[in-house]
Amino acid sequence: MIDTLFFLFFLFFDSPLRRLLLLCAVLALRAPTAHSPILRSSIVTPTARAVSEVSGCTTIDPDFLVEISDSNQTRAMSKARVYTEVNVIRPKDYWDYESLIVQWGEQDDYEVVRKVGRGKYSEVFEGINVNSKEKCIIKILKPVKKKKIRREIKILQNLCGGPNIVKLLDVVRDQHSKTPSLIFEYVNSTDFKVLYPTLTDYDIRYYIYELLKALDFCHSQGIMHRDVKPHNVMIDHELRKLRLIDWGLAEFYHPGKEYNVRVASRYFKGPELLVDLQDYDYSLDMWSLGCMFAGMIFRKEPFFYGHDNQDQLVKIAKVLGTDELNAYLNKYQLELDPQLEALVGRHSRKPWSKFINADNQHLVSPEAIDFLDKLLRYDHQDRLTAKEAMAHAYFAQVRAAETSRMRSQ
């Protein structure tokens, strides 16, 4: 049938471009269904995919959406429950980072003092502003695509002044190598592996609440962080100051856009990333926050300790159960590859009480368990939003203290 249609249409389509587009569509229909090593899902034909690849994002034109699945049904796009249209309403120059013209500062204004860390995309140093003598953080970027650098700068500029968002002070580059560096405010943080075991029940409530302020703000500005983890949450415990840092993987949220699932650090990857669901949203950050919170209250870091991405899903399934995982997959018309399905196996849901012991019981209250349970959900649509999380009973003491403090000022 397809061959006959192809022959007839080829006779009538005299334009080479039209013939090429038709050929792509027919070949896609004739080809055997291609499967990811992890997941079998709906396949979108090449004609449906807009020619727009921005840092792993693919825009799908709904007017040309053709999906082929085992059930021959089209899966509706998943959209964020909150702040869905932020970047639809705002002018293009708010989120169009590829058009950003960087205003470079003077590199000679800053001197490196000592190395404080390194990541996949950068090396981080404590520095000093030679003019003001103030400490700063210098993030020297490794060679990456210019649009990725522009994206991080644009996002930091848009979030400037937001609660508990690290402040970008300057952007400079070496005159010879053209290597760019981002200059940030200095935060005198303690390594989380040293700090977390010393935190009280109230400390954890306080710092998670402060982190939620940062997340709700960035989400309200149409931005997903996509790499929430202890390494990226700087805490100056003496000043009780928290800053959410490293916005290198952050991205603007556009409803209907498919995003790269190769984001976030393994132990904090949401199930949506592990099953290759690309139309994820801000709720990814809430899963990562939940993993971080579980590690803090149960004193088990990391909480889900997978050896690779497939094993990460196995570790999650052993806690949340496979019946719930299958319900999630069915809802979004996804299917695990047989190899991964075999690895995951069958597991019943484990009650959170199983993780309570003599060392952590003083941190695990009923409201803490309820809060955690509403974050660590397979279905990203069922997780608390950052604003909903801030209203949870777990933070009643923190909200009361904040209200009292504001009244006394």
Curated annotation (Swiss-Prot):
Active site: D227
Protein name stated in the entry: Casein kinase II subunit alpha-1
Example GO molecular function: protein serine/threonine kinase activity
Underlying gene: CKA1
Top-level lineage group: Eukaryota
InterPro entries assigned to the protein according to its UniProt record, in alphabetical order: CK2_alpha, Kinase-like_dom_sf, Prot_kinase_dom, Protein_kinase_ATP_BS, Ser/Thr_kinase_AS
Record-level GO BP terms: regulation of circadian rhythm
Entry keyword set: ATP-binding, Glycoprotein, Kinase, Nucleotide-binding, Nucleus, Serine/threonine-protein kinase, Signal, Transferase
Signal peptide: 1-35
Similarity comment: family membership: Belongs to the protein kinase superfamily. Ser/Thr protein kinase family. CK2 subfamily.
Glycan-carrying positions: N72, N188
Summary of the tissues where the protein is detected: Seems to be present in all plant organs. But seems to be less expressed than CKA2.
Localization, UniProt: Nucleus; Nucleus, Nucleolus
Catalytic activity: L-seryl-[protein] + ATP = O-phospho-L-seryl-[protein] + ADP + H(+); L-threonyl-[protein] + ATP = O-phospho-L-threonyl-[protein] + ADP + H(+)
Key word Nucleotide-binding present: yes
Function description: Casein kinases are operationally defined by their preferential utilization of acidic proteins such as caseins as substrates. Phosphorylates casein in vitro. The alpha chain contains the catalytic site. The tetrameric holoenzyme CK2, composed of two alpha and two beta subunits, phosphorylates the transcription factor GBFl, resulting in stimulation of its DNA binding activity. CK2 phosphorylates the transcription factor PIF1 after an exposure to light, resulting in a proteasome-dependent degradation of PIF1 and promotion of photomorphogenesis. CK2 phosphorylates translation initiation factors.
Gene Ontology CC: one annotated term: nucleus
E.C. number: 2.7.11.1
Record: residues binding ATP: V116, G117, R118, G119, K120, Y121, S122, E123, V124, K139
Subunit structure: Heterotetramer of two catalytic alpha subunits and two regulatory beta subunits.
Coiled-coil residues: none
Activity control: Inhibited by heparin.
